[in-house]
A protein has these predicted regions:
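Structured secondary-structure scaffolds
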Residues: 188, 195, 202-203, 207-233
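Proteins synthesized as precursors that undergo proteolytic processing into mature forms
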Residues: 60-61
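Extended, regular secondary-structure scaffolds
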Residues: 54, 71-72, 77-206
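Catalytic or ion-translocation cores adjacent to nucleophile or general acid/base/metal-coordination motifs
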Residues: 2, 20-42, 49, 70-103, ...
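Inter-helical turn/loop segments and adjacent helix faces that build the functional surface
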Residues: 21, 44-56, 77-81, 127, ...
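Terminal amphipathic helices with adjacent charged low-complexity linkers/tails
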Residues: 71, 84-88, 94-98, 153-159, ...
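Function-dense linear segments that define catalytic or interfacial modules
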Residues: 1-22, 30-33, 44-47, 216-334
Length: 432
């Protein structure tokens, strides 16, 4: 956080609420620890700037506390709504009570007696109807007796950086649920799903898979969290499974790799590769991909890592992250809708070119200085994944290996620039 980086963690090893502890007693559960981490992230400004720390929280779909986790932000958002609406209602009705206490049509102390002051009685009834606490109503009347003509009551708004959001929990991370193919099949079959204890792998609870799926869908609709990470598919596309499985991602989810690894990221601004006639400068983009792959490779030895373990694994796997930005701007400038077949074909082609060129450049570097230390024991897995990528870039619907769910291949037909499709194919031919 301090250096301006984000973290991603899978918290599924934490015991569920009520599970027994080795030293006796019961666990306080997953949510108590997540709330602590949330507060810590909110207190630390990322890289010393005004931006808060970036954090991804991931929990497996079979965790005993998964239901509370899914509902977490929904409930917190409701608290914000209650704070905003309640504060404004309280201000309104307390103001009405104060004004009634100073009604000039009523004289003396009768102004503060609802039996004698009909306006005050009406204001009190309205305040009670709006669920304004009785002690607040009486406090206003007491203030009015002392000569005050107005009362201050702080109101809140729904600005994302407002005090209302700072008051509630769960606002300092992206939340995701890791779902497996087994869970998704249980949803389709409308079957039961077992929530598993962390200590002894016993069944903590059986719930209906469809009900949990609906809960996830509603939460995502209501407050944009949690997201989904498809655990089975992610690990089937894992290039280095001999080093362990993939359990989590970085905050934006573009980096998914082994625990205790890190990745330096670089993004290419796609608008810089747009010619005046609207066409995409493929040779310049390929050159930039080669150049930045080399730059990121060099950065592995120059980067500062937060722990010895992360530094060691980053050296052993030499992870790098090359991406692009401004795809929306490029599509708009070219006159294509973001959510269109043409837009998806352009985006898919550019992504395939970038990734294929990066892997081919990596192989070229390896031919000069040797592959990354953990390559040999992962070679067959990496080549399988690369060949699957190549098939997708060529638009193939079959021939994939080691996949339960096949990818959506690159669709050449709607792409307005077939040169992009050709370049994508060539890039992956070279990579493999």
């Amino acid at each position: 956080f301090k250096s301006g980086s984000g973290t991603g963690s899978n918290f599924s090893r934490i015991r569920g609420e009520g599970e027994s502890l080795s030293g006796g007693g019961r666990s306080s559960g997953l949510m108590s620890f997540l709330r602590i981490g949330d507060r810590a992230a909110g207190a630390i400004k990322s890289g010393g700037t005004t931006r808060r720390a970036a954090k991804m929280v991931t929990v497996d779909v079979d965790h005993p506390d998964i239901e509370a986790y899914v509902d977490w932000k929904v409930v917190e958002e409701q608290k914000v709504a209650a704070l905003v609406a309640g504060s404004k209602l309280a201000q309104l009705h307390m103001g009405e009570v104060m004004a009634a206490c100073h009604d000039e049509a009523v004289s003396g102390d009768d102004r503060f007696d609802p039996r004698a002051n009909k306006r005050l009685k009406k204001a009190i009834i309205a305040a009670r109807g709006a669920m304004i606490p009785e002690n607040y109503v009486q406090r206003v009347i007491q203030f009015a007796r002392q000569g005050y003509t107005e009362i201050e009551f702080k109101t809140y708004d729904t600005d994302w950086d407002s005090e209302a959001y700072l008051t509630v929990a769960g606002q300092n991370s992206n939340n995701s649920v890791r779902v497996s193919n087994e869970f998704l099949q249980a949803v389709l079959d409308k079957g039961d799903w077992e929530l598993v204890k962390r200590r002894d792998n016993g069944v903590a609870k059986r719930i209906n898979a469809s009900d949990l799926w609906e809960k996830i869908a509603y939460a995502a609709w209501a407050c944009a969290d949690p997201g989904l990470q498809y655990d089975t598919t992610i690990n089937e596309w894992h290039t280095c499974p001999e080093g362990g499985r993939i359990n989590a991602s970085n905050p934006c989810s573009e980096y998914m790799f082994l625990d205790d690894t890190a990745c330096n990221l670089a993004s290419l601004n796609l608008m810089q590769f747009r010619h005046e006639d609207g066409s995409f400068d493929i040779p310049a983009f390929e050159h930039a991909c080669r150049f930045w792959t080399l730059t990121l490779e060099i950065s592995v030895l120059m980067a500062q890592f937060p722990s010895k373990e992360i530094a060691q694994l980053s050296y052993e796997y030499r992870t790098l992250g090359l991406g692009f930005a401004n795809i929306g701007g490029l599509l708009m400038a070219q006159g294509h809708s973001y959510d269109s077949d043409e837009g998806r074909a352009i985006c898919g082609s550019i992504s395939a070119i970038m990734t294929g060129v990066a892997y081919a450049t990596s192989a070229e570097i390896a031919s000069e200085v040797g592959p990354f230390p953990q390559y040999k024991k992962n070679a067959k897995h990496m080549l399988r994944v690369m060949k699957n990528h190549r098939l997708a870039a060529h638009g193939k619907a079959k021939g994939y290996k080691g996949l339960n769910i096949l990818p959506v291949p690159l669709d050449a037909a709607p792409c307005p620039d077939q040169k992009l499709i050709d370049a994508a194919k060539v890039a992956w031919d070279k990579a493999v």
